[in-house]
Amino acid sequence: MAKMLKFGEDARRSMQVGVDKLADTVKVTLGPKGRNVVLDKKFGSPLITNDGVSIAREIELEDPYENMGAQLVKEVATKTNDVAGDGTTTATLLAQAIIREGLKNVTAGANPMLIRNGIRMAVDKAVEEIKKISKPVEGKEDIARVAAISAADEEIGKLIADAMEKVGNEGVITIEESKSMGTELDVVEGMQFDRGYVSPYMSTDTEKMEAILDTPYILITDKKITNIQEILPILEQIVQAGRKLLIIAEDIEGEAMATLVVNKLRGTFTCVAVKAPGFGDRRKEMLEDIAILTGGTVIAEELGRDLKEVTLDMLGQAESVKVSKDNTVVVNGKGNPENIKDRISQIKAQIEETSSEFDKEKLQERLAKLAGGVAVIKVGAATETELKERKLRIEDALAATKAAVEEGIVPGGGTAYINVIKEVEKLTSDVQDTELGIKIIVKSLEEPLRQIASNAGVEGSVIIEKVKNSEVGTGYDALYGKYVNMIKSGIVDPTKVTRSALQNAASVSATFLTTEAAVAEIPQKEPAMPAPGMGMDGMY
């Protein structure tokens, strides 16, 4: 297929138009007085949001060169979202500023390769200084502040802080749509997996159709149990001990199932059987997790263990087990805390090593089940449009909170970028064009605060000067229009978000400046549809 070509200044300017179109759409959402953007959807109601990456993903431009520029900046937002989960609007804004300032110098004859070196030097210095002013997150109050700033809603901040307090930093917090109007928190403590009882006759509470076992023994095996004789020796020992039993097996059917159900109905012995969670290798790992959590042993075929030889010390134990039609929850397993800690470290190492997003997600779930539990935030609203918008804000706030726990917090509202300018300005280079690269970053670091001020309806330049000349940590509270100590006032950003936004923006923008030619496909003109025939065939 034939291609179109553009060179030099012409190519860069065309792409810059696309960058500006995307960034101008996204940047109106920045700050406490930022507005929302409406995104049209082919199906369902339009989406109203202030989430930078959701807006960027929707933008496709007609002109192929402009679209190239827009797609490059879209990558900045997407990468920042992948790494930090928030800060996508800031990243887009910084990319626009670096490209704008950089192109002025390239047009004036500066060498883009040397400018790129200066940009890299300045960004490395800025990131180093951001880390120096970073403070660790201390307690529930700091977590609530980070989430509240990200979501622009104190109630959401409190909700996320509660969730993190209950399941711990390693716990999994999921966000679901609620059927009700309100937003609420639901916490599942202990290990939950999505397998229910194999027979409804095993339920102990017929009204709720649940089986609740207090201090049960837990038999964990990857075998299929069909013959009651296989497990009869261990069943007799459990009956003598006067305890209940949970069986986790590949499957339980035939005579074995019938015998257990009959004994349950007669009141002789309470036993609940569930199928093992997961599939293939993941099933083996999950059974091992359950065994470590409950202090039991997996009776596995490949390890040469036989069900007839099982003794009580091979069984796991827990404070209680709750089994419904679809789920099983094991609360307070009696496993050795040291073994559980070692297993958690092992899973963390696997998370670091894996490159697959799917595997990472599954490992994270296993980690949460071992470490704390699962919290579900159920988002409610009056209409579907409001629900989608609210859900996106909570997702961003949750990601920001996790980032803050990892790397700490810095003064928010663009203040951290202003605070590091003095140190970046001290950088020097013998090469003039590299010096220009440093100055480009110094100018671009002002942009987030300028935009926050602009969205609040005030002149940014005056505010930037005032913050520059104030002590580190003092910034502009755009909501109330006053200068405050940002950390004390609870206006904070996660260090990881602040750092990632700058690094990703600089990475793409510096490469953009080195562009000397652009190649695009010639748009194909769709032929007009032929007009339908008006006559009726075969009639005269």
Swiss-Prot record:
Pfam families: Cpn60_TCP1 (PF00118). It comes from the Bacteria. The keyword Signal does not apply. GO terms for biological process: protein refolding. GO terms for cellular component: cytoplasm. Together with its co-chaperonin GroES, plays an essential role in assisting protein folding. The GroEL-GroES system forms a nano-cage that allows encapsulation of the non-native substrate proteins and provides a physical environment optimized to promote and accelerate protein folding. This is Chaperonin GroEL. It is an enzyme of class 5 (isomerase). Belongs to the chaperonin (HSP60) family. One of its GO terms (molecular function) is ATP-dependent protein folding chaperone. Its EC number is 5.6.1.7. Keywords: ATP-binding, Chaperone, Cytoplasm, Isomerase, Nucleotide-binding. The lineage of its organism: Bacteria, Bacillati, Bacillota, Clostridia, Eubacteriales. CDD domains: GroEL. It catalyses: ATP + H2O + a folded polypeptide = ADP + phosphate + an unfolded polypeptide. ATP binds at T29, L30, G31, P32, D86, G87, T88, T89, T90, G413, D477, A478, L479, D493. It is found in: Cytoplasm. Forms a cylinder of 14 subunits composed of two heptameric rings stacked back-to-back. Interacts with the co-chaperonin GroES.
